[in-house]
């Protein structure tokens, strides 16, 4: 095995030993199979290639100070993948099989789970897609589930820090009654040009408003948004937003900290009233927002004058990571400790 510099891992793909596969045909899922190949063959007329029948997930495994490996809320990822399968008319992958695949992949690649002190983790990527050959626009009759893992470094190389976002109304994340609530590749392909433009302008990512009226906050890049004011954790409610497992967890922790939690429509003007703001998701847990510039109105909403994260964001970030790594007790049954 190559010598891995655990303290300087980036957030990218690195080959590991094994991946898990499962095929669906004749109306049923087969057994889980272990493969050491990074490649597979697929029919050139597969529905995934032509009509976007695809969904994926992202979750992590962490090595604790006690040496034990913990996987965070994989049951929630299994359910969300089933929702995405429903939304794209794919065969639903059973929750028990999903969790078995995660466990098997992490155990088989245990040597790639980074040491506790590195702050790194093992990223787990399940993907489900149509492999059946179809020329007409219709669901495939055959599907494949693949799950691979790769070690990734902490999202913030220079420590927990704020970044700027930009509102650009020329871009929509998804249609009002479209696929935004599902974790499908097409949503991410559609965001690439907006993300690139934001980066070119010096921002970490784009800040989306609702596609119908451009009045309400939707998402920030590929992450959920939250704002903090008057001891209240506020996050947008919309059928276009992917239900974030991280955001769901942060809402629970905020309530435990004595905060009020509101999930509702958030008008863009309300940005001016927030004491703190952040984007949340699997990759970073929380990405604190330094400011949000409105490209069209030239308005700027500043949440951190000194560039440092706010106290609530920092407390929530540290609390959730402590649970993930086993530094604090898991009182919610979120973590699966692998034997």
Model-derived regions, located:
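Extended, Lys/Arg-enriched charged tracts that mediate electrostatic binding to polyanionic substrates
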Residues: 115-129
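Charged, gly/pro-rich active-site loop segments
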Residues: 96, 105-119
């Amino acid at each position: 095995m190559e010598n891995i510099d655990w303290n300087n891992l980036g957030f990218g793909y690195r080959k590991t030993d094994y991946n898990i596969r499962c095929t669906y045909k004749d109306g049923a899922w087969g057994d889980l199979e272990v493969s050491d190949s990074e490649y597979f063959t697929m029919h050139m007329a597969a529905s995934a290639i032509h009509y976007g029948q695809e969904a994926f997930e992202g979750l992590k495994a962490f090595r604790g100070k006690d040496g034990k490996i913990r996987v965070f809320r994989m049951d929630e990822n299994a359910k969300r993948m089933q929702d995405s399968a429903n939304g794209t008319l794919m065969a639903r992958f059973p929750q028990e099989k999903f969790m078995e695949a995660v466990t098997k992949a992490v155990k088989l690649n245990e040597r790639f789970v980074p040491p506790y002190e590195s702050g790194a983790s093992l990223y787990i990527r399940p993907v489900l897609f149509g492999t059946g050959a179809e020329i007409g626009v219709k669901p495939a009759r055959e599907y494949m589930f693949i799950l691979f893992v790769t070690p990734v470094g902490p999202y913030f190389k220079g420590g927990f820090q704020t970044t700027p976002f930009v509102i650009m109304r020329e871009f929509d994340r998804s249609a009002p009654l479209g696929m935004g609530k599902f974790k499908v590749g097409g949503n991410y392909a559609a965001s690439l040009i907006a993300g690139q433009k934001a980066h070119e302008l010096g921002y970490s990512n784009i800040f989306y408003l609702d596609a119908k009226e451009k009045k309400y906050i939707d998402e920030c890049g590929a992450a959920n948004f939250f704002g903090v004011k008057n001891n209240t954790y506020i996050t947008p409610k919309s059928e276009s937003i992917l239900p974030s497992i991280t955001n769901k967890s942060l809402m629970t922790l905020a309530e435990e900290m004595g905060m009020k939690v509101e999930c509702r429509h958030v008008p863009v003007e309300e940005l001016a009233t927030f004491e703190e703001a952040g984007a949340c998701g699997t990759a970073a847990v929380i990405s604190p927002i330094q400011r949000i510039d409105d490209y069209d109105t030239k308005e700027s909403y500043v949440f951190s004058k000194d560039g440092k994260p706010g106290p609530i964001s920092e407390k929530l970030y540290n609390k959730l990571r402590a649970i993930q790594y086993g530094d604090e007790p898991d009182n919610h049954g979120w973590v699966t400790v692998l034997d």
